A protein has these predicted regions:
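Ser/Thr-rich, low-complexity intrinsically disordered terminal regions
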Residues: 1-185
């Protein structure tokens, strides 16, 4: 089982960090930026934006990349309105200990994972001019990065993780099941 598992793991995108046959432990890791919600569930968000003729409802899985619009809290160009398109770019890292040992019934296998979910954000600035009913991207600003620090959310298999934000995440079990499915006992 051990040799087959190591061989099968080497064919996946998971990185084998450490192999210790004597202690019966394998340590593997991964980092992804696409389809994160396949691996962790951080809920769903619904952002509504309404400004003159522009009506948008953005519903998205919090774990995944997304974009939505929101108005600036302070308006300095009245009657014009400044608003932003916000781009969330999350990533997920997982690191797992895989324990493989003989037992009376065959082979005992367990997978325990530590996940870390984080996102960075960027935004574009727009100007709405009601006199012309015009929405214009302010390209002179360029896409800006949000500089405030977003606390990573870390959690283990079968635990919920949350930070200072309102986001709570939990494993879907996909990673652990993919590892277990590699093993033919």
């Amino acid at each position: 089982v051990w040799d087959d598992l190591v061989a099968d793991l080497s064919k996946t995108f998971y990185v084998i960090n450490n192999i210790d046959k004597q202690s019966r432990l394998l340590n593997v890791s991964f980092r992804i930026t696409d389809s994160i919600s396949d691996y962790v569930d951080c809920g769903i968000s619904d952002k509504k934006f309404s400004l003159a003729s522009k009506q948008l409802d953005s519903i998205y899985k919090v774990a995944d990349a997304s974009s939505y619009f929101y108005s600036a809290e302070v308006q300095t160009n009245i009657p014009n309105t400044i608003y932003f398109e916000f781009f969330r770019q999350p990533s997920l890292e997982g690191r797992a200990n895989i324990y493989v040992a003989p037992s009376e019934q065959g082979t005992k296998v367990s997978v325990n994972t530590r996940y870390t979910w984080i996102f960075r954000a960027e935004y574009d600035t727009y100007l709405y001019m009601p006199l012309y009913d015009s929405h214009t991207k302010q390209s002179s600003y360029g896409r800006r990065q949000v500089t405030s620090y977003v606390e990573p959310i870390s959690f283990n298999t079968n635990q919920r993780g949350g930070g200072l934000s309102d986001v709570l995440c939990v494993s879907t079990g996909k990673f652990e099941n993919e590892i277990l499915n590699l093993i033919e006992i």
